Amino acid sequence: MTGNTERLLIETTTAWGIPLSEHQYAQFQRYLDELIIWNDRFNLTAIRDRSAMIRRHLLDSLYLARDWQTAPANLIDIGSGAGFPALPLKIAYPTLPVTLVEATGKKAEFLRHVIECLELTDVRVLHERIETVGRNLAEREQYEVVTARAVAELRVLVEYALPLLRIGGRLLAPKGRDPTDEIAAAQRALHVLGGEVSACEPVHIPGEEPRSLVIITKIAPTPSRFPRAIGIPARRPL
C-alpha cells in the first residue's frame, strides 16, 4: 500500500498495537477495491472516497481491537452490511472465527464474494434476520464478542445481541459522540436481558470527529423468550 492515507493505516494500527503484515495490507487494499466496484451496483456504503473509507471503515473497525492482548475465542457481527467492523478484524486476526449476520441478499452476496477473494477461512455468512439467529439454540449463548455498527439504538440492539453472548461475553457497540441518553434509555432492557454497561470510551480516529464505544458485558442468562419475534424489538423496545 502506498500514499499518505495508506501510510495512515500503517502508522495508526502500529500505534494501536495491531501489527499487520504486507499480506494483510494487501488484503485491505483488495477489500477496498472490491467494495468500490460493488458499490456502483449495490450502494453498499455512502462513503465513496477511498481515503475516507480507510478512516471511517477500516480504522473505525480496527479501533475495537486496540486493547486486545489476544483475539477472542469467536465473534459474531450483527447487520454486517459491507463487512464492517468484522471483516477488518478477521483480516487483522486470521485465526479468529467470525460469523456475519446480514438479512439483505445483495449484501450477503457481497460478503461471500469478498471472503472468497481474500481467501479468508473460518468465516460464515448467515443470510437471516437477527431475531431468528438469536432464537437458534446452535447460536444462542455461543459467542465471546458481538459487534454491531449503526444497527439500532442501544435498547433495541441489546435484545439482538445479548441472547448470542455467553456469560462474561461483550457487546462492542460504536456510537456517536455522546451516547448518555441511549445508555439511560437501555437500562431496563439491560436489566431484563442480563447485561450491564462496563465501559463507555471515547474513540479518536485521525481526521474524524470524536465518537464513542459502548461496551456491554453479559452478567446473567437471557430469558428464553428473547429476542422476540421479527420486527417486535424495533417496534416495541423494552
Swiss-Prot record:
NCBIfam families: rsmG_gidB (TIGR00138). SUPFAM superfamilies: S-adenosyl-L-methionine-dependent methyltransferases (SSF53335). Specifically methylates the N7 position of a guanine in 16S rRNA. HAMAP family: 16SrRNA_methyltr_G. InterPro entries: rRNA_ssu_MeTfrase_G (IPR003682), SAM-dependent_MTases_sf (IPR029063). The keyword Repeat does not apply. It is an enzyme of class 2 (transferase). This is Ribosomal RNA small subunit methyltransferase G. S-adenosyl-L-methionine binds at residues 79, 84, 102-104, 130-131, 149. One of its GO terms (molecular function) is rRNA (guanine-N7-)-methyltransferase activity. The keyword Cell inner membrane does not apply. PANTHER family: S-ADENOSYL-L-METHIONINE-DEPENDENT METHYLTRANSFERASES SUPERFAMILY PROTEIN. Its EC number is 2.1.1.-. It is found in: Cytoplasm. Keywords: Cytoplasm, Methyltransferase, rRNA processing, S-adenosyl-L-methionine, Transferase. Pfam families: GidB (PF02527). Belongs to the methyltransferase superfamily. RNA methyltransferase RsmG family. One of its GO terms (cellular component) is cytosol.
